[in-house]
Amino acid sequence: RRHLRIKVLHCFYAYFQDEEKDIARADMQLKSSLDKMFEMYIWLLSLVVEMQDHAIAKIEAGRNKKLPSPEDLHPNTKFVTNSFIRLLANSKILNNKSEELSVNWSQERELSKKIFKELITTEDYKEYMESPERGFSHDKEFLLRFFKRHMINVELLHDFFEEKSVLWTDDLDLAAGMAIKTIKTISEDDADLTLLPLTLYIVCAISSSPVRLIF
């Protein structure tokens, strides 16, 4: 909620700087801003799955070479079998929301491939792949660290979001915070992930009562 409080305070500031004090317009701007931030949050979660898809494609391409190397024939499949990412990939909630918001990395395949190539050169990725440790907790800890240290800091990703919406220029930290919180709350026993209920906060945030705006 702290991230959304910040967003609401920004809108408060803009409202009180507006000579016309048009509360309907302020409400509309706030809702639009929160909606776009939620969409960005879905893009980030979906990117995790997209990275695994690229890893799978890389392995398949190696196996289909005319003269595959021993590494091509016997690849390290630790990342492609990461159980935590598989939960995200199989999430009906995430897939449905992605479809609803037209979040589709397959339409940005070349960009996501470049991001993938950059990420697999990181030391955290290499250490994870070389570690003999396995299991959901290990997979989750890696992803959390990998996401915070690397995925959200890729310049190509920043450029992509900036081109998608000028509203996203300052919102990456907020959306990333939401994604990180979501990752932290998922457990091995969960049948599906739980997205942060941003729509509930929007209802509170756009209320015309100033008291209700502090939540």
Segments the model singles out, each with a brief description of its role:
Residues R1-F215:
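Class I Rossmann-like S-adenosyl-L-methionine
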